[in-house]
Amino acid sequence: MSTNTISHVGDLNDEQALSFFGTDGIRGKSQTFLTNSLVSQIGYWCNHVLLGEGPILIGQDSRASSERIASALAHGLATKNREIWLLGLCPTPAVSHLIKKYNASGGLMISASHNPPEDNGIKIFDKTGEKISLEKQIFIDNKLKRKVLIPICKDKDNCINRNDLLKDYKNSLLNTVDKESLIDIPIVLDLCWGSASSCGEKLFKALGANVISINAIPDGEKINVNCGSTHLEHIKKVVLESNAQMGFAFDGDADRMIAIDGKGRVIDGDHSLYLWGSSLQDKNMLPEQRLVTTVMSNLGLEKAWLNRGGKLTRTPVGDQHVHKAMLTNKASLGGEQSGHILSTLNDLCGDGLLAAIQLSSICNRKGILLSEWRDQSFKPYPQKLISVPIAKHITQNYLNKSEKFRLSIAEAELDLGKEGRVFIRKSGTEPLVRVMVESIDKLLVESLTTKIAKIALEEFN
């Protein structure tokens, strides 16, 4: 395979010695990990990396703990005399967009994305609307590890409720497509009891769609529970029963999206990336015909995109890695199989709502059903992913040193040959090791994934 058409970025076994930051910010159990004391310290040390005189924005998802965490963050942030704008319930990409629009010094989003309701997290953005750099993460991480006593401001007079700004974010999305571009198209939205419920239905109705919304009210006890982008059974059923043309399922903070076509079939981030990318490529609007994706993306996507004459860059897992590679390669579109899609339309911030209105609007403009468009794209290689629970102290280096585990991977790679691959990754947000096997032989995929996962369970618990 030619190196000028596909490239890899980063060391896939890299592991930063961070105690608090994972793949996407700080995340853990809301009651036992994200205590008021820790959260206030996070806010305080954010003052040292989010520089400038502009306001600091705080957004949140619907989790029961989000209000408490927002208050504790504000206590820590209030030690510096600048305004703190409380956005309330909103999607993560809204925080990023509003930081740039209002020249804010930075922002924080309180969410644990697709994690269960009892978890929560904090994503930190600098004044560019981008997630803070690794250097800034290390600074905050080191300060938190040392448990330095910090001054806490009891008054929060500089906190201002600005939930009125959500309309600016919604309008920015509407401006990316033709008005009324979804007239009378039946579309199902799974709003996941989370952030997408703040504006998702209004957004699609403004474009003329006949919207059927499920899990549509913000509910901190139900967010991500058997719904949203990681639990698709409900939306599949509703799409089929309602004869909708398509459906879109979001995660807790609406930065990722998985689509369902009118036949009830899943269109994950790989397919979304290919479909949107091919539309841009056809209009000569894709620089170098390049897509950026991660090591988890399907080989079917890779081969199909190269056959179109495109270039593909793979990165480690995490939208921040995709973002960095897009900047380096001057790419305009990238994403992850999990449903994060990044585009220059919104300054390379993963945005599930943007991806959803783009796909649906392109379908309407082409005069094609999403199911038909999917059939014209690519056939994924059989791929199986098992998330294996492991002890909390297990690191990537520990995984690499297990002879039995390494041997099972090597044997699997021999069995697969050139038409398949094994990928092992420790989760950056949960005590899990993800075992993925991919090949043209479905039965071989099943047996090898199960075998490696069983050994991982035995070795790392």
UniProtKB/Swiss-Prot annotation:
Activated by phosphorylation. Gene3D superfamilies: Alpha-D-Glucose-1,6-Bisphosphate, subunit A, domain 3 (3.40.120.10), Alpha-D-phosphohexomutase, C-terminal domain (3.30.310.50). It is an enzyme of class 5 (isomerase). The active site is at S113 (phosphoserine intermediate). Binds 1 Mg(2+) ion per subunit. The keyword Glycosyltransferase does not apply. The modification Phosphoserine is found at S113. HAMAP family: GlmM_B. Belongs to the phosphohexose mutase family. This is Phosphoglucosamine mutase. It comes from Prochlorococcus marinus (strain SARG / CCMP1375 / SS120). The gene is glmM.
